[in-house]
Structures are given as structure tokens and as C-alpha cells.
Amino acid sequence: MAPTAKTNKGDTKTAAAKPAEKKAAPAAAAAKGKVEKPKAEAAKPAAAAAKNVKKASEAAKDVKAAAAAAKPAAAKPAAAKPAAASKDAGKKAPAAAAPKKDAKAAAAPAPAKAAPAKKAASTPAAAPPAKKAAPAKAAAPAAAAPAPAAAAPAVAKPAPKPKAKAAPAPSKVVKKNVLRGKGQKKKKVSLRFTIDCTNIAEDSIMDVADFEKYIKARLKVNGKVNNLGNNVTFERSKLKLIVSSDVHFSKAYLKYLTKKYLKKNSLRDWIRVVANEKDSYELRYFRISSNDDEDDDAE
């Protein structure tokens, strides 16, 4: 009976190992399926990290944290294997209960192994984004470099040099053109005209005082009548009228006024105004008597 019992114990060990392997196989397959899915999922963050260069630093930090967590998780399954072997050696007596416990113990390390496999798979999948992020970062400064290079010439424009002031030219003394009649002293005018009324006044045909009054009333100075002031003065010496003036007026103007006076008194037909000198006039009769003598001689 003893040998048969030994053979039964060996069969129980092999029988217990087979269900454990069968259970471990689907667990490993499930672990592989789970590992492959994270790889596919990890590829998406890799593409997102390549597009968003700014998030590369955060992805690198996550990778480091995952690697640090994977190391203690891998150490735990390694310690769990010897513990499971010692339990199998100590539990040889109960044949029916041992296979169930061994199957559970074998199934427990299988998920534990799958967990590090997932983490290990996530670390290499996440690592490429970090590598891709590095060239992306390098490309970003390279792209940004031309902008400062282009801006550099604008900043480095040379300041305009102050133009040297030209030496002041020697100032020329310019003589102002003085217009004629401005700023010059006017020469004093002194006019003296005489009108000789001796021949007419002796015959009591004409009054010299009345003639003087008429000339004063009609004579214009600066275009105005009764504007003589101290500029024009009148004198009578015997039967002559003397007109003195500091204002310029023509000799003919005085002759014009004398003729008007003779015409007013109806003396213009017998008396005429004759210039005997440069500045004087004389009143004379027309030669009527000479014509009468000629008529008498003809008879």
C-alpha cells in the first residue's frame, strides 16, 4: 500500500501543476492583450505630445514617475515566487484542497506579472514622445532664431550723425534803397507873384481891395478853399497886389483867377492880362483908339 500511495502523491503534484499552467496561460494571454492595448493607447499621447511641444515636459515627468513605480512592482512578484514554492512544499498532505490553493496562488502572481508588464510597456511607449519632444524643442528655438536675427538689423540701425554746422558766412552790409521822397527833407518853397493894376486903377475902373478879397476867397491850398493859413499871404503896394506862398501853385492859376474877376465885372472885353516879367502880370487895355485913328485917316 505504501508504494501505491507514493505514486498517488506524484500524480497529485503533476495534476496540480497542469491546472495551474492552464489557468496561467489565459492570464498571460490576457496580460499580453492588456499590454498591447496600452501600447496603442500610448501611441496617441505620443502623437499629441509631438504636436503640443509645450506639454512635452509634463509627459517626461509622467514617464519618470511610471518608471519609478515599476521598479518596486517588479520586486514584489520576485518575492512572491519563493513564497508560493514554500507553500506548495508544506501542503502536500491534503491532495484535494492543495490543487485549488495552488491554482489560486499561481493565478495571483500572474496578474502581478501582468501589472509590471503593463508598466514596462507604457514606459517604452511613452519614452518616444520624450525623444520626439526633444527635437520639437530644438526645432522651436531654431524657428525662433530667424526672428531675432531679422529683428537685429532693425535694432542695430545706426543713429543719424548730426550734421556739422556750416561756418556762418560773413554778413554783408546791405544798403537799404531809400525811396525818393521818403526820409528826405523837403525844400522850402517860397513863391512871390505880383499883379500890376496901375493903368486900370488910375481910371477908377477897378478897385484893388475888392480884387484882393476875390482872390483870397477863390484860391485853393491842397485842393481846399479858405485853407490859406500862414502858407499864403497878400500885400498891396500902391496899385499892385503881391501874393507870397510857401505852398506850390502855378502862376497860370493866378492868371486864371484874374480873368474870372474881370469877366465877373464885365471888364474882360477892354482889359487883358499880360505877363510883363517872369513872376508878374500887368492889366492893360486893348488898342481901340488906334483903330479909330485909322478910320479917320481913311475918310
Curated annotation (Swiss-Prot):
GO terms assigned for molecular function: RNA binding; structural constituent of ribosome
Keyword set, alphabetical order: Ribonucleoprotein, Ribosomal protein
GO biological process: cytoplasmic translation
Domain of life: Eukaryota
Compositional bias of kind Low complexity: 65-98, 105-142
Record field: transmembrane: none
Lineage: Eukaryota, Metazoa, Ecdysozoa, Arthropoda, Hexapoda
Gene: RpL22
Protein name: Large ribosomal subunit protein eL22
